[in-house]
Amino acid sequence: MVNIRPDEISTIIKEQIEKYETEVRFSAVGTVLQVGHGIARVYGLEEVMAGELLEFEDKTIGIALNLENDNVGVVLMGDDSNILEGSPVKSTGKIAEIPVGEEFLGRVVNALGKSIDGKVEPVCSENRLIEMLAPGIIVRQSVCEPLQTGITAIDSMIPIGRGQRELIIGDRQTGKTSIALDTIINQKDQDVICIYAAIGQKASSVAQVVSTLEEKGALGYTIIVAANADEPASLQYIAPYTAASLAEYFMYKGKATLVIYDDLTKQAQAYRQMSLLLRRPPGREAYPGDVFYLHSRLLERAAKLNQKLGGGSMTALPIIETQAGDVSAYIPTNVISITDGQIFLSSDLFNSGIRPAINVGISVSRVGSAAQIKAMKQVAGKLKLELAQFAELEAFSQFASDLDKATQNQLARGQRLREMLKQSQNSPIPVEEQIAIIYSGINGYLDEIPLQKVSSFIKALREYIVNSKSKFIELIKSNKQLVSEAEEILKQSIQETKATFLASE
């Protein structure tokens, strides 16, 4: 029989008592009154903050959006099927935040920063709030550097600068996402971090974007934030803010960033759904009264910081989908008034084979021209005016039977300029080659080229300049303007290519 030694037992008990630390945890706990459609009403959380994260019994997280006298309206960031009436809800004392860091580059994450690409979860040491205040006036500087999209029509007539907000607006299937992806692909070797926020899209569309970027070698400097169509409205609502927070991390490190929100129409619809379920009073088109603030607080986070803060920038390209070209609807007019210009894509132009289908007449850039390189200003100054005059003349010529020679020449040149600006998908053009293309069109070198052969001639000219006249590219890169030596080389290149091209026809 084992001997019991009371003195040893009492010593052990005394030791345990001495080491025992009392830890009292206080947490505010409420009760679910009602749940359904991704919304829960909770009673008893009297000290909860607006936007605070709440934890339900099944570990589902929600955001407190409505703070009322007798209950709190919570939007759920997960499935509500396991949440029952009467179940407890804990307040966490935290506001929504995500991990941020270089580890996210090349990854696909959800609106909460969790990996959804099947790879290892990124491990980051830093967190950042999803909702951050936009930089103030003093810490900003005016837009002074260009952000080249690689699309000739945009870089010449609707230029975008680093730190600008440029809206891409148009009907469905007019090439809005293609412009955004071309811009990402064109940032290769430009030291620009790109973030693509896919809001309310099909998972297959997001997979296609990922494969395109991977194929073009652009995924390494890109982060994709996806809140797919089958995810709760709350995740579609916060996805753009998550993308902005990831971009801000790099911006405050002195880097240039580009954020694409594809698209904000779906975010507004998700917010409308949440607001109506929370019984907020509906306004125009049933959107809540603060839908303008929804987009303004997001887009104001785009900025070009001053040199004291490292000179980083966040350029925003929000996308808005219109119905039958109606830019005067509620959400389009809101976002047009917030941004620094818009690129309007027309379904009529798209269907008539003009791609990218940019309507130059109503597309503008309010600040980007200040950041355009001098060489582009020199050659593209007249381009927008010539195209506008051509569009007017073309409409008039449909009713006129006989036109004088000058009008016929103007129409012929306009058709060639329009042909010159056509560009295939996922093939951005470097700015030096764009200058050569526009110079040849504006100065009448394309007038003798048959209309259907213009694209072949431009391809031949680009190849000739890259392979045989690389000094032209070096001169533009170093001087940023079309010096007389570069112009002479360009004229010679165009004439030599033209002679060879016309001889082979």
From Swiss-Prot:
Keyword Ion transport: yes
Annotated membrane topology: Peripheral membrane protein
Site entry (Required for activity), positions: S363
Primary site of residence: plastid
Binding site for ATP: G170, D171, R172, Q173, T174, G175, K176, T177
SUPFAM superfamilies noted in UniProt: C-terminal domain of alpha and beta subunits of F1 ATP synthase, N-terminal domain of alpha and beta subunits of F1 ATP synthase, P-loop containing nucleoside triphosphate hydrolases
Protein name: ATP synthase subunit alpha, chloroplastic
Organism from which the protein derives: Galdieria sulphuraria (Red alga)
